[in-house]
């Protein structure tokens, strides 16, 4: 109804949240935008390379990030309509049809394309349900913790949990010493002292956000790695409980 009445200039939706891993209904939103003839932008940085990209190419705008699917850091892409008002943020030169000035990093772009092709092939050959089972076993082991977005569809590699007891900094330090690199949020939010706007929007109280720890894995992560992390979390939990 709001789309029909207000006619926004653009609707933007994340395909998968970078802090919690929760999947967003981008395909359904895209269908609504088609019905009401509203341009649609999908931030697919977290989705591409982890889940099939089918349907993303039909969105008006799609962005992706190379290092999320095995490509080099510092390069990404934006798919946009060949026609239409796309205002450049970097001006000065005619590169990329005048939409982004500056010399292209051709080597990184080609590496990104190769990595994406390889990862999409791997996705077609891999049953990610096994990876989901490893993650689910880890989640089930977190007794006393609250999983953010519990019950919702999520990426197979990301878990954001509200842990009991001490502040997250102590969890992160102790787990790091045990050999596990966990975080207090996404890399995009590192260094910020204010509560995450994502967690706030999900109804997490300000005093609870200081106990949220994010766990994520990669394609090479094994069942044994998840099991070792489970033991590490339990050990640290006992230490913090005194």
Provide a role label for each language-model segment.
Residues 1-242:
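Pyridoxal 5′-phosphate
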């Amino acid at each position: 109804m709001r789309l029909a009445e207000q006619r926004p200039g653009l609707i933007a939706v994340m395909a998968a949240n970078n802090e919690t891993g929760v999947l967003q209904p981008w395909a359904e939103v895209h269908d609504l935008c088609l019905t009401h003839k509203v341009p649609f932008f999908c931030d697919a940085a977290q989705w591409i390379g982890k889940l099939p990209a089918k349907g993303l190419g039909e969105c008006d705008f799609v962005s992706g990030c190379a290092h999320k699917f095995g490509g080099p850091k510092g390069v990404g892409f934006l798919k946009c309509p060949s026609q239409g008002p796309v205002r450049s943020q970097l001006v000065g030169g005619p590169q990329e049809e005048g939409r982004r000035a500056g010399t292209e990093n051709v080597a990184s772009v080609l590496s990104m394309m190769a990595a994406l092709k390889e990862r999409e092939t791997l996705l077609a050959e891999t049953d990610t349900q096994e990876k989901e089972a490893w993650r689910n076993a880890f989640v089930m082991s977190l007794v006393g913790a609250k999983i953010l977005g519990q019950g919702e569809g999520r990426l197979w590699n990301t878990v954001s949990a509200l842990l009991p007891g001490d502040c997250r900094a102590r969890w992160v330090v102790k787990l790091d010493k045990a050999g596990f690199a966990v975080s207090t949020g996404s890399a995009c939010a590192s260094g910020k002292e204010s509560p995450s706007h994502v967690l706030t929007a999900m109804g997490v109280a300000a005093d609870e956000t200081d106990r949220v720890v994010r766990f994520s894995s990669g394609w090479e992560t094994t069942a044994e790695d998840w099991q070792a992390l489970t033991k590490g979390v339990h050990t640290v939990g006992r230490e913090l409980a005194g």
